[in-house]
Amino acid sequence: MAYAYRRTIHLADTDAAGVVYFAQLLHICHEAYEICLIGNGMDWSGLLREGTVALPIVHSAIDFLRPITWGDRLDIQLYPELENSRQFKISYRIFKENQDSPPESPLATALTRHVAINPRTRQRCSLPPVVETWLRNAPKIEDSKI
């Protein structure tokens, strides 16, 4: 079972055409990532205060499969995956929330790729053990189309 985050699309999330603005949906995916870390007991603020590692996004992608509009209640599923000792990715599947039946096909899919760097030198470094443990224990995506 994926990590999940629920979010309602606000008017400010949409563009002039009345659909969610592409960058805003990536922002919402990042919200889901942050909430997932907190929900899994990660002391993210402690890691940031230590100043020994940063995890910038070096690649992102998003595919819109159906319109997402103001008022839509979303169920965002996260699948973090360790790629190597310095890098991981998170695959996202965005569904319209439906509490009465299994989700339909996704409205959108997204991906973010993160690397560990030393914030002082900006050189790649190993992921902190707590992050690596979180990734190793994360749910696995059933379908690797993302």
Swiss-Prot record:
Lineage: Bacteria, Bacillati, Cyanobacteriota, Cyanophyceae, Oscillatoriophycideae
Keywords assigned: Hydrolase
Pfam family, one: 4HBT_2
InterPro entries, A to Z: DHNA_CoA_hydrolase (IPR022829), HotDog_dom_sf (IPR029069)
Function: Catalyzes the hydrolysis of 1,4-dihydroxy-2-naphthoyl-CoA (DHNA-CoA) to 1,4-dihydroxy-2-naphthoate (DHNA), a reaction involved in phylloquinone (vitamin K1) biosynthesis.
Name of this protein: 1,4-dihydroxy-2-naphthoyl-CoA hydrolase
EC code(s) of this entry: 3.1.2.28
Gene Ontology terms describing biological process: phylloquinone biosynthetic process
Enzyme class, first EC level, given as a word: hydrolase
Family in the record: Belongs to the 4-hydroxybenzoyl-CoA thioesterase family. DHNA-CoA hydrolase subfamily.
Pathway assignment: Cofactor biosynthesis; phylloquinone biosynthesis; Quinol/quinone metabolism; 1,4-dihydroxy-2-naphthoate biosynthesis; 1,4-dihydroxy-2-naphthoate from chorismate: step 7/7
Positions of the catalytic residues: 15
Disulfide bridge partners, by residue number: none
Domain of life: Bacteria
Protein's UniProt keywords contain Hydrolase: yes
Gene3D superfamilies: Hotdog Thioesterase
